[in-house]
Amino acid sequence: MALVDLVRAGGYSIEYPQFSSMAKLKEFPHSEDGKLVRLLSWHEGVGLGGGLFKVSTSSTATGNDGTVVVASNGVRLLRVVNGPIWADMFGALPNSDIDSMPAVAAAYAYAASVNTDLYIGVATYKFKGSTPINIDPSRAGIIGYQGKVRIDCSEFTGSIVFSINSSYSYTPAAYYNNLSPALQGLYVLGAKTSGVDGLLVGRETVGADKSYNGQTEIRECTFDKFDRNIRMGHNSWRFVFYKVNSLNALSPNGILYVPAGLDDSGEILSFYHCQFFDGAGSNIRLSCSSYTMVFNTCSFLNITFFVDSASSATVTCNGCNFENPGSASTRRYVDISAGHTNVFNIIGGSIVTNSNPGQTQALLYVSTNNLLNLVGVTVPYGGHYQQEQELGYHAFIGGAGTVTASGVMLQLRNGAGTCPLHSSLSTFSNWDFGYGNLNAWTVDKGAGTSSVVEYLANAGPKGTGGAMRVAPVSVGTNVSQVQAVTNPGMFSMSCMVNIATTSGNAGQISIGFLDAAGNSIPGGVSANLGTTTGWKVIGKNTLRGKVPIGAKQIRVNVQTVAGADVKYAYLLCNVVK
């Protein structure tokens, strides 16, 4: 009885009326000011959303059916709140026939008004209607309990389910306190409905004031099957995504979309342990200039990361995984295809290509005046690599931009072979006969003065680009070039060859090394041309190796036997370290 006496001494009664549902609580004509009543359940017989309410005959507060209830006679009942705010207090119910969105929206509005987070209990909830929930990270977030809350938005018809944007601006003084998650622990599922997006990060329209969104965090959430799962808006800067997944979107840009022209946006968007997956044609696209994104130990699965910003976008992937699990489609992983001064860094991590009928695209692509940096990665290779079908030559990376490589490993013991990285790393001058002649190449016809060694325009594998035709008459012909090289390092070379006629093996391409005095040293390799006619790749599993210790020069020699008629194009060799 001591506990009962203590409760009564505190001004509370333990003999108070009980109501089985919110509807019955509102129907009763409450009139005794200060009286405590108990709501057993918001919905009849469910056991969720109950609690103590205190009758207030003087209150004129607006009812929200959660913390302020207006009875049938107009009297207010005020919820006794002494802990976290839960969505079920406002009528949210894990039931596929009940639209819980109005309840969650009302619960969040109250939580934000008192600067505390809203919690949603473990279950699956249905969201219908068309009005988004706008989250103000400076005031309150929405947290799914234990990270196991599922929200079914398959019948939602609005343009956005959730948007995140602070009500605080830079002036007169920023709140500087977006330290609790704006969203956490939610699996938000759509139905691939056109025009319905899962999450807008930032503002939909440009405002005269600037929202202070720094340090806003989205944690342990999944957005699945929306038109665009995650879309960046105006004032999107210094947002943090931790263990966020974006899966199976409808739009070609639906996995993660950063549109052009965003106002006051792009200062360090950070992603940690996130997963981006599709496989049906939806991708990541960064189109906004001066936008910086950093991905740490994230996975990019069966998607392409497009960068078509007009200028100055920067993407850094630290320890990330690029892969095509379970896919039979040829796919590019990174495509920097427009603008200028865009930078994409791949630092550590893994690049994996599971076998498919034919990898006919270069895995990575960087257009002119843009930069792709590879640091501390192993370059994969497979027998299904057929990048020459797209590029006209055999290389891991396509495009006319610039590639740098530091601490990069070639798979020299891969039975399928290796390939050079990129044309900008070419060891040899005029590797593609792009000078419009054979300059930089030394021709040795020997005694066969009538042998043909000539430049041909628009004669490459795709009917464009230059080629070198060699047709020795009486003795074989050698075409060679020597360039400086440093060690340690690894080399890989590929060459496109088209044999028109030959009576046997048409010749050989060899790579050798010289010391500082010009003496040959061990470590060279060679590849026979064979007899097969038509354009083909030479060097996949033969023209590769380590630069030997002491090497100061690298020499390539193209030998064509007498009686053969061969075209050569794109003699691409890279030395990386």
From Swiss-Prot:
Protein's name in the database: Depolymerase, capsule K2-specific
**What are the protein's UniProt keywords?**
Degradation of host capsule during virus entry, Degradation of host cell envelope components during virus entry, Host-virus interaction, Viral attachment to host adhesion receptor, Viral attachment to host cell, Viral tail protein, Virion, Virus entry into host cell
What is this protein's function per UniProt?
Functions as a receptor binding protein (RBP) and mediates the attachment to the host capsular exopolysaccharides. Displays a depolymerase activity that specifically degrades the K2-type polysaccharides of Klebsiella pneumoniae capsule.
Q: What subcellular locations does the record give?
A: Virion
Origin, by domain of life?
Viruses
Q: Name one GO cellular component term.
A: virus tail
One of this protein's GO BP terms?
A: symbiont entry into host cell via disruption of host cell glycocalyx
Q: Which family does it belong to?
A: Belongs to the K2-specific depolymerase family.
SUBUNIT field: Homotrimer.
